[in-house]
């Protein structure tokens, strides 16, 4: 499970150092792809395979599935952390997420999200008021 928020920097070669606590789960390989709200999703290879299998068994006649799958898979890149725990984020994905030097790497349960630091801060500010309301809708009776 991925938890917490970290603030690594992107180097000039498009490499980002993963938080140490995330590396063990990602050392066997990972997939980076477009996420929602202009962030990037990083999945351990096993989780990405599970998602792929789920999408593969869905009916190809569903237009929404075709549309989503095209974007999700065509933007995906596989990688593995190097000895320093760095991954290389391909230029098209850096552009999509608006990544500059300062990034935020968030644990999001089964995935990691990579955000541009300014974009993450703006997202947090926009969600602050609705957070309490969403908990009632998303987690009724759980918390």
From Swiss-Prot:
Disulfide bonds: none annotated. GO terms for molecular function: DNA-binding transcription factor activity; transcription cis-regulatory region binding. It is found in: Cytoplasm, Nucleoid. Residues 5-47, 76-119 form the SpoVT-AbrB domain. One of its GO terms (biological process) is negative regulation of DNA-templated transcription initiation. The keyword Iron-sulfur does not apply. Pfam families: MraZ. InterPro entries: MraZ, MraZ_C, MraZ_dom, MraZ_N, MraZ_sf, SpoVT-AbrB_dom, SpoVT-AbrB_sf. PROSITE patterns: SPOVT_ABRB (PS51740). GO terms for cellular component: cytoplasm; nucleoid. Keywords: Cytoplasm, DNA-binding, Repeat, Transcription, Transcription regulation. Belongs to the MraZ family. Forms oligomers. This is Transcriptional regulator MraZ. It comes from Frankia alni (strain DSM 45986 / CECT 9034 / ACN14a).
């Amino acid at each position: 499970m991925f938890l917490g928020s970290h603030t690594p920097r992107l180097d000039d070669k498009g490499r980002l150092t993963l938080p140490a606590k995330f590396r063990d789960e990602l050392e066997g390989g990972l997939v980076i792809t477009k996420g929602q709200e202009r962030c990037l999703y990083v999945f351990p290879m096993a989780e990405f395979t599970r998602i792929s299998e789920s999408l593969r068994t869905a009916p190809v006649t569903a237009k929404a599935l075709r549309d989503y799958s095209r974007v999700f898979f065509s933007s995906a890149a596989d990688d593995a952390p190097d000895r320093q725990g760095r991954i290389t984020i391909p230029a098209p994905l850096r552009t999509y997420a608006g990544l500059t030097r300062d990034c935020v790497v968030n644990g999001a349960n089964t995935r990691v999200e990579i955000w541009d630091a300014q974009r993450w801060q703006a997202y947090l500010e926009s969600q602050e008021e609705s957070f309490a309301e969403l908990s009632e809708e998303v987690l009724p009776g759980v918390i």
